[in-house]
Amino acid sequence: MIQPQTHLNVADNSGARKLMCIRIIGASNRRYAYIGDIVVAVIKEAVPNTPLERSEVIRAVIVRTCKELKRSNGIIIQYDDNAAVVIDQEGNPKGTRIFCAIARELRQFNFTKIVSLAPEIL
């Protein structure tokens, strides 16, 4: 479960390393974000000499959460950390590589470009 003020790792090579969630896109009173949800975040740590800089406000899609994800067939998926992929306004990733395994549920939310860049789909 991701809520405002939650710190996230970045799972791509866009130039950001750490993010902090400041808003969850969706209903006005939405409290938590899960895998596949879009959040507004601020960059807390960035790689030097990249287009993304510290304190820049961006959009990101959640790809890993510590909160377990339960599927209808009984499988439970749980990650060790919270992570996101930086996206643009159209929903395309800003990076060209993704470094972690991605849950199959992202395909249902029309993030097919992120799924195609992932090295493994769980």
Swiss-Prot record:
UniProt cross-references to InterPro entries, sorted A to Z: Ribosomal_uL14, Ribosomal_uL14_bac-type, Ribosomal_uL14_CS, Ribosomal_uL14_sf
Q: List the disulfide bonds.
A: none
Localized where? Plastid, Chloroplast
**Which controlled-vocabulary keywords does the entry list?**
Chloroplast, Plastid, Ribonucleoprotein, Ribosomal protein, RNA-binding, rRNA-binding
Q: Name one GO cellular component term.
A: cytosolic large ribosomal subunit
- Output one GO MF annotation: structural constituent of ribosome
What are the GO BP annotations of this UniProt entry? translation
Q: From which domain of life does this come? A: Eukaryota
Q: Which residues cross the membrane?
A: none
Pfam families tied to this protein? Ribosomal_L14
User: Which PANTHER family does the entry link to?
Assistant: 50S/60S RIBOSOMAL PROTEIN L14/L23, LARGE RIBOSOMAL SUBUNIT PROTEIN UL14C
Instruction: Give the record's family classification.
Output: Belongs to the universal ribosomal protein uL14 family.
HAMAP family named in the record: Ribosomal_uL14 (MF_01367)
> Any idea what job this protein has?
Binds to 23S rRNA.
Q: How does it assemble?
A: Part of the 50S ribosomal subunit.
Q: What is the protein name stated in its UniProt record?
A: Large ribosomal subunit protein uL14c
